Structures are given as structure tokens and as C-alpha cells.
Amino acid sequence: FCSYGHEQSFNAPVGKYAAFAYTAALNHLLDDKENVQTIGDTTVVCWAEGAEDIYQTFGVAALFGGGKEGLSDDDLKRLANGLPCDDLGIDPNRPFYILGLAPNAARLSVRFFLRDSFGALMKNVNDHYERMEIVRPSYEKFTYLPLWALLRETVNLNSRDKAPSPIMAGATARAISSGGRYPASLLEATMLRIRAERHITWGRAAIIKAYYLKNPHEDCPKEVLTVSLNEASTNTAYTLGRLFSVYEAVQQTANPGINATIKDKYFNSAAAMPASIFPVLNNLYQKHLRKLEGGQRVYYDKQIMALKGILGESYPARMTLAQQGAFDLGYYHQTQKRFTKKEEENNV
């Protein structure tokens, strides 16, 4: 281009009317603050052909959360199945656009631009929420995790900068909207927070499950990617996570009100190097078991023996990241089952 005298922006010239038209349209979209979302450093705007506000409102609510009046889970599922919502006047075949813009020096760069029917977008979003579905504590106020809450699971909430990685946030938004694979950085950031805090929240467990359902890996098979505890699973990493949860339950029962458990000291090493750590945990378990009364002792011993029967005599020396994900899900599922049982007993 330079040989023709085209330098800087002149190597891709834009006509005056075209420049006016797209900047005026973009400014109009950005002025509607209710339908503009910021994900990391990416500003996301969406619109439908025909410009009816209901498409923008529904699209933003489905993708980012917001609980707009008149929008329900049933509406989302109907559109995902290609069925119209006559009461809302929404056509699933209406062309719909999503634009993600990010700053680039003194300019803007297009992080992603998606065009599809509105129904196809709703199917991608609905599929994402179904992958994310996992048993949750009763105190959680969300029935599903909106994008902003999902990204919050990847950051240290005690740090000064609570913003997620901009590139990861944009890639995650694009994956959900397009139905593509989740970025590896989403899983890595989630696992990093679990290891740093030794705490598996509902959101983090949901991310692990959704990630490996969309990005399959033999070390974290489908049998462990269930909504609730899969007692029939013989997966070693998943079973080790379950075993760790029961060991912790025995310790808490033997020492009511303790401030720290084996999770605070051994969780990370147990997930990464089980062959080295589980013999130590078993010795602690024997000491804790002796403090329990007869009925409690039998109850926990049966669970431990059943899990050890699945595992056999030898444990893995090291586990991959995917196996650690299966371990985390096993621990989470087993722990949630214990808490659910306690709540049911308290409500009787």
C-alpha cells in the first residue's frame, strides 16, 4: 500500500457517508445504557434487524442476567427450541448481532462480532446454562450463574483489583454466545482460585463441569460431570475427592466447632499427589474415628470402606489438571450431599 502513497488509515479508506453511518449507529447503541454491558475491558452491544427493543432487552438479560420483567426461563427454552414467544412478540428467526469492542491505543478494536438468528443465540445461551447446572447450596440466590458472577469466581475478592482478565472475559462471552469451546484461561483461573483459597464454591464447581462437557478430556470423563453425586462412578480422581470429603466429615463430627480442617492443610497436595498424602489422611481418620460413638463410627466406616473398595490398594502418584478437576467435583458433590442431608434432618 505504501508504494501507492497509502499510509496509516489510508491503506483501508472508508467513505465519508459510511464513516458517518457506522459511527452514528454505534453511538446510538452505546447511548442505551441498559443494553450495554462491560465484560473486562470489552464493551458489548447487541441489536436485531428491525430495531425492536425487546430483542436487545431479552438478549442482554439472557446473556448477562438482570431479571427483566416478563422474561422467564420458559421463554428462553422456547426460543432455544426454535419456538416463537407470541406473548412477547419475539420471532426466533430474527437476525441478531452481538459486537464486542475493546480499546487499542487511541482506537477501538473489534474483539468479536457474531451474527445469527435470535433463536440460535438463545440455544447457545441455554446450552451453556444446562452445562453449568450443578447441585447448589440452599443459600444461593441465583438459579443459574449470570456471566458477571461466573467471571467473579476467577478473581481474588480480597484484592484491590477485582477485575477478571480482560482477554479471558471477552473469550468467555464469545464462547457462550457462539456455542464455541470455553477458553483454557477460564479453567486455569478457576483452578488457581480453588488452590489459593482451598474453597470450591458452587460457581467454581459449575465452571469445571461446564468446561469439560464442552472441552472433553479423558481424565475428566462424563461420568463425573453430573448435576449431583454419582455414587456409581468408579473414576479414581472423583472417588478420591469423595473420600477426602468423608475424611473431613469424620474430623468435624469428632471435633465439633473446629476452626480449621484437613482441607486447610492437605487439600491441594491431596488433589495433586494423592499417593503421598492419603496415607497421612487415613492415619488422622483412624484417630478421629476413635472419638466417635458406636453408631456414628459404623456409619462413617461403611462409607470409607466402600470408597476404598473402588480405589483398590494403590493411589496415583500425581494427577493431571483434568484429574484434579474430577477430584474437586467428587469433593464438592459428596460435601453437598452431606449438607443437603443435614438440612433435611433439621427440617423434619
Put a short name on every predicted segment.
Residues 1-348:
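Extended alpha-helical scaffolding segments
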